[in-house]
Amino acid sequence: MLICIPDILDKAEVADFRRVMDAAEWEDGRSTAGAQSAMVKRNEQLPPDSDVARALGQRVLSALTRSPLFISAAIPLHIFPPLFNRYASSNGHHFGVHVDNAVRGDRLTGLRIRTDLSVTLFLSEPEDYDGGVLTVEDYYGSHEVKLPAGHLVLYPASSLHLVTPVTRGTRVASFFWLQSMVRDAHARSMIFDLDTAVQALVERLGRDDPETVKLTGIYHNLIRYWADV
C-alpha cells in the first residue's frame, strides 16, 4: 500500500525548514546506509546526531500527530527519528535500487524498531529540480512519486525502491521509518480501508448511527486482534 498524504507541513514551515537546513553542515549520506545500500547511495544528509537534525526531526514528529490520515494509514507504534537528505545535480546525486534494512537502531536514544513502513517528506517543490523521482516497486508494479513540498509518501519498507539522478537543481527531503502496531501489510491495508469507510459513514449518517457504531466496533476489534503494543 503506497499512500500520498498532503500538507504535513505548510509552505511557511517548509520555508523555515529550508532556511535552517541551507545554513547547516552536511555529510556523505552513506554514513547511515547498510552494506548493500552504501554501494548505490550518492547523496548528502544532515548528521543524524546534530542539534539541527534532532530539532527539525522533532518538528516533523509533531506535524505527523496533526494528520489523521497518517495515523490511520500507518497505525504507528514507534517512529524512527527523522533524517534529512539532499540530492544536488552538481554532484550527480542519486540512489540506486535497494531495500531498506529490516531493523534500525538510533545511536542517541537506543531505540530499535522493525521497519514496517518507509516515509519520505518532500521539502523541495517539484518544479525546482529535474529527476530525483522516488520509484517504488510493489505487487502492482512500479510507482513514480514526486510530490509538492510539505507532502509525504508512505510505503512498505520491504519494497525495492530508488531515487533517479537529479539533473537540475536540488532535491531536499526528510526520510524515516516506522514500526506499525499492525505488522502484516495486508491486515494494515484492510484496517485502513475500513477506517476510511467508517469515517465516510460518520460524515453521512452521524457518529451515533447504529450501523456506524457497529462498524466502529469491528474496526477496534480488528486492531485488538492484530496489534502488537
Swiss-Prot record:
EC number: 1.14.11.-
Enzyme class at the top of the EC tree: oxidoreductase
UniProt keyword Amino-acid biosynthesis present: no
Classification via InterPro entries: Oxoglu/Fe-dep_dioxygenase_dom, PKHD_C, PKHD_hydroxylase, Pro_4_hyd_alph, Pro_4_hyd_alph_FE2OG_OXY
Domain Fe2OG dioxygenase: 78-180
Residues given in the record as 2-oxoglutarate binding sites: 171
Record text on cofactor binding: Binds 1 Fe(2+) ion per subunit.
GO molecular function, one term: iron ion binding
Name by which UniProt lists this protein: PKHD-type hydroxylase OCAR_6723/OCA5_c13470
The species this protein was found in: Afipia carboxidovorans (strain ATCC 49405 / DSM 1227 / KCTC 32145 / OM5)
